[in-house]
């Protein structure tokens, strides 16, 4: 891929994004060596990508199971539109929920949570059921955990 006029991203930007997704702690100098750019040129590209909202954050990837949150679930909730705002506020403060998606289909929201055990899950469901019917799926295993995005090669 050379230059994508829709996104304004060129091949070097994609390579930079690829490297940062693999290790966001790499120094400008290390990135520059891999990209054959000077550290200031790397910094300029990163700043431009940040300003355009392409790079939103630099984060650590936490193993929730190592923190005692080994039960991972998806919760689907049917919420009446008049209650969306209250529901969203409740979700923001509910322990264990780390994703909330407003979706199409029979459900209104799909949540992803990590809790300690079945008792913790039951308490969470009891809080959510006040907003409407819930359906829960326990994640038994994960076949694909892709957090690394790359462009389709032409």
Residue ranges and their predicted role:
Residues 1-154:
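A compositional/biophysical signature of low hydrophobicity enriched in polar/charged and small residues
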């Amino acid at each position: 891929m050379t230059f994508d006029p829709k996104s304004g991203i060129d091949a070097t930007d994609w390579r930079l994004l690829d490297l940062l997704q693999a290790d966001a702690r790499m120094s400008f100098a290390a990135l520059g060596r891999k990209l054959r750019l000077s550290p200031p040129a790397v910094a300029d590209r990163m700043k431009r990508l940040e300003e355009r909202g392409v790079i939103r954050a630099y984060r650590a990837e936490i193993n929730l199971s190592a923190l005692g949150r080994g039960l991972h679930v998806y919760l689907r909730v049917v919420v009446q539109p008049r209650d969306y705002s209250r529901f969203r506020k409740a979700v923001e403060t509910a322990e264990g929920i780390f994703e909330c998606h407003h979706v199409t289909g029979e459900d209104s929201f799909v949540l992803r949570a990590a809790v300690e055990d079945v008792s913790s899950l039951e308490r969470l469901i009891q809080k959510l059921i006040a907003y409407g019917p819930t359906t829960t799926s326990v994640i038994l295993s994960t076949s694909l955990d892709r957090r690394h995005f790359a462009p389709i090669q032409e």
